[in-house]
Design a protein with these regions (language model features):
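Conserved hydrophobic positions within beta-strands
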Residues: 89-91, 123-125, 181, 226
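C-terminal cap/linker of serine protease catalytic domains
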Residues: 49-58, 165-169, 183, 218, ...
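Bacterial N-terminal signal peptides
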Residues: 23-36
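N-terminal secretory signal peptides that target proteins for export/translocation
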Residues: 1-17
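N-terminal activation segment of mature serine protease catalytic domains
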Residues: 37-78, 88, 97, 110, ...
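Gly/Ser-enriched beta-turn/beta-hairpin loop segments
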Residues: 74-84, 126-132, 170-173, 184-200, ...
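Conserved active-site neighborhood of the chymotrypsin/trypsin-like protease fold
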Residues: 45-48, 73, 93-171, 234, ...
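Catalytic nucleophile loop of clan PA
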Residues: 90-91, 205-225
Length: 256
């Protein structure tokens, strides 16, 4: 959680705790689908899917959730005692692509990815989308378990969602919280004065280190990437909606 004063409606990010930087760049939205790069997109119609109990959803998704450990350069410029941060990410495919938030890896000097098996492996940032606060990390590791990404075009206010991530980089595996989709198409102002659009609002508890982790539905499919919380309220968290990410992820994978 980013500390400091915030104006109303300006949520802090819920991941890396040191000097997040947001930039506004124009991006090229690739028309390619995620499936062209091997990312698991699933049927669009909920009627063709089977709702799972929450424990089954967790068992399905947890192997695809990673911890993102970073080391950055302090403001003084010296690398001695460089602050470390942590967040979460989600495995996109067996080729080692990991999706996370850009503010977790902005300005860092090294990235290490912790898998659900407990294995730590070096990662490198291969692409970024500054507008959506997304970044793509690549690792080399065997037996990766990609997450399934929902292809549903409509989410319903009130439907159950589950946030999975690694708050505080706690040992023993990822943390799970459950809530509902509270609202759709939210726009929020970042502490740096930029605006994120088309966000999902949820009351699933999001904590420091959850940034970059998935928000999933009762089918065990990713419907969003956790990105921010409202500092002046309780139980208001935000996630980037999957429909807003489809083309940017494909574009980043093509570049990375």
């Amino acid at each position: 959680m980013v500390t400091g004063p915030y104006s109303p409606g300006s949520p802090p990010r819920c991941g890396r705790t040191h000097r997040p930087v947001w930039c506004m760049l124009s991006i090229f939205l690739c028309s390619l689908t995620l499936s062209a790069f091997g990312v698991e997109r699933q049927p669009a119609h909920a009627a063709s899917l089977t709702e799972l109990p929450v424990p089954a959803v967790v068992s399905k998704v947890r192997p695809s959730v990673v911890t993102v450990l970073t080391r950055g350069i302090p403001q003084g410029g010296s690398q001695h005692g460089a602050p470390s941060g942590s967040g979460s990410g989600i495995i996109l495919d067996t080729n080692g692509y990991i999706l996370t938030n850009n503010h977790l890896v902005q300005g860092v000097t090294s990235v290490v990815v912790g898998l659900s098996t407990g294995r730590l492996t070096p990662g490198r940032v291969v692409a970024r989308d500054f507008l959506l606060d997304l970044a793509l990390i690549r690792i080399t590791a065997p037996d990766l378990v990609p997450a399934e990404f929902s292809q549903r075009t409509t989410l319903e206010i009130g439907e159950t969602v589950i946030a999975i991530g690694n708050p505080l980089a706690l040992k023993g595996g990822s943390t799970v919280t459950v809530g509902v989709i509270s609202a759709l198409d939210r726009s929020v102002l970042t502490p740096e004065g930029e605006t994120l659009y088309d966000l999902l609002q949820t009351d699933a508890a999001i904590n420091p280190g959850n940034s970059g982790g998935p928000l999933v539905d009762r089918f065990g499919q990713v419907v969003g990437i956790n990105v921010a919380i409202a500092p002046s309220a309780q139980a208001i968290s935000y996630a980037i909606a999957i429909e807003a990410m489809t083309s940017p992820i494909a574009s980043m994978m093509a570049r990375g």
